[in-house]
């Protein structure tokens, strides 16, 4: 049985690409036709590509690999957080901080600072500090949590990136490529597929399309984890 059906993809509007004037010719092989000035994505290819990405993620997660979900555009923020949390992986759904991967040690320092403030709050230190100082610390914590909350448990570099709209996330893509971290991407008709290892040709602007495809990546992780649990139980 295939991982995803044509019906699911159609209902979520995965086939709607961008306007024909905003396209990347490298995406030509994934385009089925043009309708009313919009490119229509070949969903048979999307089905196949979802399957390839799913198998890669399942195998990676089955070997203990970690995946970082990245989607900072409005249409992706909620799905990225929900699905990454559902499968126990990491995410960035606000601004990508330059150096998140290539300057990992510095990012870890910021995470350490976030943990310090959290501990101060838990230990009741806030109760004995001047009110003004507490307000400042709470603001700092909020800001750090906003940008780093989804990666605060990420102790080392991820084994793969799952990116929604590589054009929007070009800094994340460039950092992953520099470090040879494989990238799975939801790639619309205006993107460059050559930068992505596992291309999922799809509409990256519709919330339902993004949710559907992101949930499939999370499902692959969960299937791998269930397989691990079953293997442990069998032992």
Curated annotation (Swiss-Prot):
<keyword id="KW-0689">Ribosomal protein</keyword>
<comment type="similarity">
    <text>Belongs to the universal ribosomal protein uS2 family.</text>
</comment>
<dbReference type="InterPro" id="IPR001865">
    <property type="entry name" value="Ribosomal_uS2"/>
</dbReference>
<protein>
    <recommendedName>
        <fullName>Small ribosomal subunit protein uS2</fullName>
    </recommendedName>
</protein>
<dbReference type="GO" id="GO:0003735">
    <property type="term" value="F:structural constituent of ribosome"/>
</dbReference>
<dbReference type="Pfam" id="PF00318">
    <property type="entry name" value="Ribosomal_S2"/>
</dbReference>
<dbReference type="GO" id="GO:0022627">
    <property type="term" value="C:cytosolic small ribosomal subunit"/>
</dbReference>
<dbReference type="GO" id="GO:0006412">
    <property type="term" value="P:translation"/>
</dbReference>
<dbReference type="InterPro" id="IPR005706">
    <property type="entry name" value="Ribosomal_uS2_bac/mit/plastid"/>
</dbReference>
<dbReference type="InterPro" id="IPR018130">
    <property type="entry name" value="Ribosomal_uS2_CS"/>
</dbReference>
<keyword id="KW-0687">Ribonucleoprotein</keyword>
<dbReference type="InterPro" id="IPR023591">
    <property type="entry name" value="Ribosomal_uS2_flav_dom_sf"/>
</dbReference>
């Amino acid at each position: 049985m295939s991982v995803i059906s044509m019906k699911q993809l159609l209902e979520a509007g995965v086939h709607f690409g961008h306007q024909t004037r905003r396209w990347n010719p490298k995406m030509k092989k994934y385009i089925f036709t043009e309708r009313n000035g919009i490119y229509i994505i070949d969903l048979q290819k999307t089905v196949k590509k979802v399957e390839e990405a799913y198998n890669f993620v399942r195998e990676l997660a089955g070997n203990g690999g970690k995946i970082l979900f990245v989607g900072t555009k409005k249409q992706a923020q909620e799905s990225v957080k929900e699905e990454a949390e559902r499968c126990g992986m990491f995410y960035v759904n606000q601004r990508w901080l330059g150096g998140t991967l290539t300057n990992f040690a510095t990012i870890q320092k910021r995470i350490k600072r976030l943990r310090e403030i959290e501990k101060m709050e838990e230990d009741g230190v806030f109760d004995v500090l001047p009110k003004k100082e507490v307000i400042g610390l709470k603001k700092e914590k909020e800001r750090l949590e906003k940008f780093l909350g989804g990666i605060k448990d990420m102790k080392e570099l991820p084994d793969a990136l799952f990116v929604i709209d590589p054009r929007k996330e070009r800094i994340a893509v460039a950092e992953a490529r520099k470090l040879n971290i494989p990238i799975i991407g939801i790639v619309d008709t205006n993107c460059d597929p050559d930068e992505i290892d596992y291309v999922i040709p799809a509409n990256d602007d519709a919330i339902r399309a993004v949710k559907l495809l992101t949930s499939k990546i999370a499902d692959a992780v969960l299937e791998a984890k269930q397989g691990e649990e079953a293997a442990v139980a069998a032992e």
